[in-house]
Amino acid sequence: MIKVLIADDQELIRQSLSIVLNTKEGIEVTDTVANGQEVIASVRKNRPDVILMDIRMPKMDGVQCTKIIKDNYSEIKIIILTTFDDDEYVYNALKWGASGYLLKGVSMDGLTNAIRTVYSGQAMINPDIATKVVRLFSQMAKADYVVDVDQKRTENLTKTEWKIINEVGRGSSN
């Protein structure tokens, strides 16, 4: 059984999703909440497998909440389910660990499939969003985008390993 938490500031959305998803085989909605702070409290109590998270919510938005959840509960999968496809929202949600980004126009079958897909360890991104992601990735690659490295996790790498990492980062292959 896939345990799902629904986070959206609109009660009608929460209730509708809960009613429909609870009819789907293998899916159980464990809680519905209206903001990011309630997400964190619910995660502590219910430990969902997947969170359906809106972007714009009061008290704490979905992007900030995604970062906090992934920092503390890395095994939980998060699907952003929103009407907003702004580049900044998409980039930051994926940067902080969202496994999916869907627009609210998705069908219920599409949403159910997305839940099962991210639960299995894969990603699910709306086709329009995927186009944005590819464009953003291309822009970053052209700009020699720099990634911060956690020194503690890399202190034992050899010079050869660093050289390989550098080449991969530049897009080289064997």
Regions found by a protein language model. Name each.
Residues 53-54, 65:
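Active-site T/S-Asp motif of two-component receiver
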Residues 8, 54, 82:
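Active-site residues of response regulator receiver
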Residues 89-94, 105-155, 163:
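Short, flexible helix-to-coil linker/hinge segments that flank and couple to helix-turn-helix
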Residues 46-52:
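Active-site beta3 strand of CheY-like receiver
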Residues 26-34, 42:
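Short hydrophobic/Thr-rich beta-strand motif most characteristic of the beta2 strand and flanking loop
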Residues 35-38, 61-64:
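Acidic catalytic/metal-coordinating carboxylates
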Residues 57:
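Receiver (REC) domain active-site loop signature in two-component systems and cognate sites
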